[in-house]
Amino acid sequence: MKRIGIAINPSKDNENKIVQMVKDKFNEKFDLEEIIVFNSYETKNLILHKPLDLIVVLGGDGTLLNVAREISKKAYEVPIFGINIGNLGFLSSIDISEIDKALNKLKNQEYSLEKRMLLNCIQENKEPVIALNDVVVARGTLSRMVKFEIFID
């Protein structure tokens, strides 16, 4: 592993103490050439000139889902490692308190990669929405019949 990205939810680490600690721990364990830190809200503006070996997402489930969605739109094939520093962390790989143990496993290649399917939600006259976990369909302000067409390939 030579190049990693760290996506941080700035509202969870407004003094950058957590992101600095994570950078230091990765630098201690790995001989990294580059760490790119970016605001998770700005993932859609991320331009990579060289591929990353890993993206670390610091935040909660919402942060992880946002980063995964935006990375998939760019067709970057890169593993995402979620570290929960938020309130909800069902999708994250670990909690921040487990970082030392997790990085040891990562260094010793004691992990597995999970491929996740994405949902593509297309609404008439709207931009398609890509989702990792779920898509919520809710009625608007007017009560009326709703017609759904759901496909799987």
Language-model features: locations:
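ATP/NTP phosphate-donor binding region
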Residues: 1-54, 58, 96-112, 123-129
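Active-site catalytic pocket residues across diverse enzymes, especially alpha/beta-hydrolases
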Residues: 26, 71-75
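Residue-level signal for beta-strand positions within conserved beta-sheet cores that form or flank
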Residues: 31, 76, 117
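Short glycine/serine/threonine-rich phosphate/pyrophosphate-binding segments
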Residues: 63-68
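Short, acidic/small-residue loops that bind anionic groups at enzyme active sites
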Residues: 76-92
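Catalytic core of DAGKc-family lipid kinases
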Residues: 88-153
